[in-house]
Design a protein with these regions (language model features):
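Membrane-embedded and juxtamembrane structural elements of multi-pass membrane proteins
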Residues: 1-194
């Protein structure tokens, strides 16, 4: 049977959508790399730059943490802990993978929602990883770092993982209401998995 006339048109539209998203990602990443090209090493894989307004992780094979020079010294340890949590969890790999899947299925609204939820859950998981090690006073400092970093975040780029990226109100609420899981909750969860 002959190929419907509209099928090649849909294929071109799908390919164009992919091209637009990949171009956006490439341009965003190149612009970010240009901004941090003169960043100064602070410690290990942590760099500071006066040309950025918000902390983030950049890179997949050799990821680096970038901090703005303007960051408050009290906020810095919390920001670094948060960004290191991203690296320990492999978020610098998971988020680009999620974006790649979104790119292939850009026409599907469920994929857009899934990507937004992935980004939110990544941030919440890193917040939880950091705050479970903190006392009440330090949690307040962490919330302050979260708010001050989000104020300086102008736009969300496709690949970098940025501290204070999304849902700050929800993240602050989550930090305030955090309780370590009890032994019984953990036991029930383990049994449910088995």
């Amino acid at each position: 049977s002959p190929v419907p006339v509209w099928l090649p048109i849909l294929a071109w539209v799908w390919t164009a959508g992919i091209a637009v998203l990949l171009l956006y990602t490439a341009v965003s990443t190149l612009r970010l790399r240009y901004k941090v090209r003169e960043a100064v090493r602070l410690q290990g894989n942590v760099y500071q730059s006066e040309r950025i307004g918000s902390p983030f992780v950049l890179g997949t094979l050799r990821p680096k943490i970038y901090l703005p020079y303007r960051i408050d010294i009290r906020d810095r340890q919390h920001v670094i802990a948060h960004e290191q949590a991203h690296l320990r969890r492999g978020d610098h790999l998971w988020k680009p993978l999620g974006f790649l899947l979104l790119t292939l299925h850009w026409f599907n609204p469920v994929m857009w929602l899934s990507y937004v939820l992935l980004c939110r859950d990544i941030e919440l998981a890193c917040d939880e990883a950091v705050i479970k090690e903190l006392g009440c006073e330090q949690r307040a400092d962490y919330m302050q770092a979260l708010v001050s970093c989000s104020v300086n975040r102008r736009k969300i780029a496709a690949c970098p993982l940025a501290f204070g990226e999304i849902g700050v109100k929800e993240r602050v609420r989550s930090v305030m209401n955090y309780k370590k899981p009890t032994f019984w909750i953990i036991l029930v969860a383990v049994i449910a998995c088995i």
